[in-house]
Amino acid sequence: MAKRGGRVAPPPRRGEWELRFGESEAATGWEELCRQAPGPLREAWDVLSRDPRDRTNPSRQHRLRSDLGTRAIRGKMLEQWQYEVTGAERIWFCPDDSIRVVFITKASTGHPSETD
């Protein structure tokens, strides 16, 4: 829910995907990423809103493996992907094709220990 003084997110352009938080912790992590890496995070926003499954740069953007590769969001099992914002900073997200929404499930300023 938007609050006075809160950040305003642009609506998606025609053909683009909408980005939403799938977890409260992701919203907190997103704000930290905004402070630490605003330029690379804006690039991530642009890429994810255009094509969340873009495979142009697989070292930066790829589907997570094994148990991390799917996640339940709103009662649906969705693919879970990772976008490398910087060397250590990551975003995990789940695209929902039926509503063209990318759910941000993790936004981390450090390398997620789950992938070690």
How does the language model describe each region?
Residues M1-E89, P95-D116:
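Basic, Lys/Arg-enriched alpha-helical interface segments
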